[in-house]
């Protein structure tokens, strides 16, 4: 199979059009894995083979951190994660934001926990396929205080 490390390295070559020196790539990969508290042995494992749900989510954040896309859509990245894993995923996303300030993220979630340490420019609330509220990070605080019911009533 294809190892996680090989997958990311090949994807990086495809994305950038240039080869990164192996030692430099491994150093960057190790640094990103440390942020996510991933054991270095995960880099050698076959991509998504035998990974738990949490390990797959960490792998996705690792790919985000390494490939540095200008736009990323994170759909339910926090789904099924325990509190510690959500914190680590959020930290990885935060590091990505800091290192790529001109990038854009669309984070789809039912829980606001993953958003707490991130810089949020816009918040949209969607009910039944319709955006019914838009605001800044203060909208997240309002949701945490008052819940989603207030928005469902607007439909």
What are these regions (language model features)?
Residues 122, 126, 130-153:
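Conserved beta-strand-loop-alpha-helix hinge in the C-terminal portion
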Residues 78-80, 112:
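Short loop immediately C-terminal to the Walker-B catalytic DE motif
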Residues 82-87, 134:
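Conserved D-loop-proximal element of ABC-family nucleotide-binding domains
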Residues 86-101:
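Helical segment within the ABC ATPase nucleotide-binding domain
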Residues 73-77, 84:
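Walker B catalytic motif
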Residues 101-121:
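Conserved H-loop
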Residues 1-70:
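ABC-family P-loop ATPase nucleotide-binding domains
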């Amino acid at each position: 199979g294809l190892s996680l490390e090989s997958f990311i390295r090949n994807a990086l070559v495809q994305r950038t059009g240039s080869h990164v020196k192996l030692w430099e790539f491994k150093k960057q990969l190790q640094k990103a894995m440390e942020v996510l508290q991933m054991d270095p042995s995960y880099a050698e494992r076959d991509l998504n083979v035998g990974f738990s749900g949490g390990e797959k989510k960490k792998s996705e954040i690792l790919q985000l951190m390494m490939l540095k896309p200008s736009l990323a859509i994170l759909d339910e990245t926090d789904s099924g994660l325990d509190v510690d894993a959500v914190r680590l995923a959020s930290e990885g996303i935060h590091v990505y934001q800091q290192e790529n300030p001109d990038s854009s993220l669309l984070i789809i979630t039912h829980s606001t926990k993953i958003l707490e340490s991130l810089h949020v420019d816009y918040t949209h609330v969607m009910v039944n396929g319709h955006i019914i509220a838009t605001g800044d990070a203060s909208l997240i605080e309002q949701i945490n205080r008052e819940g989603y019911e207030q928005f469902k009533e607007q439909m």
